[in-house]
Amino acid sequence: MSQKILIVGAGFAGVWGALGAARVLDGAGVRSSDVEITLISPKPELQIRPRMYEAEPHKMAAPLLPLLDAIGVKYVEGSVDAISVQDRTVSVVSANGQIRSLAYDRLLLTTGSQLSRPPVPGLEHAFSVDRIEDAVELDNHLDKLAKQPASPARNTVAVVGCGFTGIEVATELPKRLREKFGADAAIRVVVIGTQDAIGPDLGPNPRPFVAEAFESLGVEALLGSGVVSVDAGGVRTASGQRIEAGTVIWAGGMRASPLAAQVSSNLDPLGRVEVAPDLRVPEAPNVFVAGDVAKASTDDSGRYALMSCQHAIVMGQFGGHNVAADLLGVPTLTYRQPFYATCVDLGEWGAVYSEGWDRQIKLTHAEGKARKQMINTQWIYPPAPNRAEALAAGNPQASFG
């Protein structure tokens, strides 16, 4: 009977995890009939989540079946709703509600993160760009608004959250809204955040460029007061201010997949599993975790991976390598990713690209935009379904420093 590696999730960590695991088996000359790799996800696609703030979100997915076929990885459609580390099984629910149990010898959990939705009254009226389905719903809503008579409320969008997502959504909106409402429409975009500075996690170096972009694009920032309620006509802040807005977009932070709690009791405040240096779960040594669901040290300086595709891709490579290596009795690798870069899209102003954890500015305006477009349209997409090229892309020691 063949041994089984299950990869749960088809985000960046899951896809590159499949590449990494297949590469190890190929290098060891192990046949798929002896060790079977299976990837489980609701759809055989990689949603290019960093692009959900852009126009035409329905196009932001990469098909996976040709790639998985090329590297000998099986695909199972469905969502995992339960994991038993004692029995080494997962419960998979298909789209039609059918439930089945799959056994594993090694498990790689890569179910990522999801938008944090606190108990704010009326939050169901807010849109998001968390998944393709959410971003398409927002796009359809804007199309419907375009058919309504112009009014200040129709032309106003309130973006709740002033982090990376909120910034990129807000700075892209003026162009998108003019394309839908007309070039002369009096557009208003307001970013609302509880912090006293825009992009609180960005640090001091990129922030002046974000402020410059906001001013250039006419994006307003209402800081120091969070949203306490949402309704179909706008939001109310903690300071009592009412903003009439036909569209509210919630970008209020992320939390790890709740499946994390089923493989470990040692979670950080974001719900991520605190993993060993090789991404193994100490409490469940047959389980490895990668991507947004893992709290993993990137270097020896006390830095930890962020919830980003940049870290998820490389963590996936290491996680896939290690889950296969461990099954074969080969030493695992310590996850290391000392290089870190940040590229924030700022709409028609351009983008700001920085390197290092202190975010030293390298490119801005049009040059930054060119780098961002390269990242968004090339670097974060899976390789072509060519076996040699795909397996090479799974090498954890050959990318991103």
What is the meaning of each model-derived region?
Residues D34-E36, Q148-A150, V190, D300-A305, ...:
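Active-site-proximal substrate-binding core of FAD-dependent oxidoreductases
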Residues E124-S151, V235, R242-V314:
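FAD-site-proximal beta/loop scaffold in flavoenzymes
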Residues D34-E36, I71, Y75-D87, L102, ...:
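A Rossmann-like FAD-binding core segment of flavoenzymes
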Residues D139-I187:
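Rossmann-like NAD(P)H-binding beta-loop-alpha module
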Residues E348-G401:
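C-terminal auxiliary extensions adjacent to catalytic cores
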Residues S2-Q3, V73-A158, I249:
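FAD-binding core/adjacent interface of flavoenzyme oxidoreductases
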Residues M1-E77, E168-D201, I249:
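Beta1-alpha1 glycine-rich phosphate/pyrophosphate-binding loop at the start
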Residues A18, K175-R178, Q310-Q337:
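Internal hydrophobic alpha-helix adjacent to the cofactor/substrate pocket in enzyme cavities
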